[in-house]
Amino acid sequence: MAKEELIEMQGSVTEVLPDSRFRVTLDNGHQLIAYTGGKMRKHHIRILAGDKVSLEMSPYDLTKGRITFRHLAGRGPGPGTGSSSGNR
């Protein structure tokens, strides 16, 4: 049985709820309840109200989602990405 395709969206956290859940408003205005993914929970990534996040949603239930990445303001791509001419 194949795994269904997940919908990836971006939004901002509007409210921190109990039990590691968050109310997220997507860029298109839709609101949903989201929880942190496994590695984010394992490494204690803190998410606060106002943070920009990427999340995955199932096409079968668009009211719930899983936060997969927290975007930091003012941070560009990391040092290992992009084209650089260093280390020759």
Swiss-Prot record:
Compartments, record wording: Cytoplasm
Family: Belongs to the IF-1 family.
A GO term from the CC aspect: cytosol
Alphabetical keyword list: Cytoplasm, Initiation factor, Protein biosynthesis, RNA-binding, rRNA-binding
Role this protein plays: One of the essential components for the initiation of protein synthesis. Stabilizes the binding of IF-2 and IF-3 on the 30S subunit to which N-formylmethionyl-tRNA(fMet) subsequently binds. Helps modulate mRNA selection, yielding the 30S pre-initiation complex (PIC). Upon addition of the 50S ribosomal subunit IF-1, IF-2 and IF-3 are released leaving the mature 70S translation initiation complex.
Gene: infA2
Record-given protein name: Translation initiation factor IF-1 2
Gene source species: Acidovorax sp. (strain JS42)
Subunit structure: Component of the 30S ribosomal translation pre-initiation complex which assembles on the 30S ribosome in the order IF-2 and IF-3, IF-1 and N-formylmethionyl-tRNA(fMet); mRNA recruitment can occur at any time during PIC assembly.
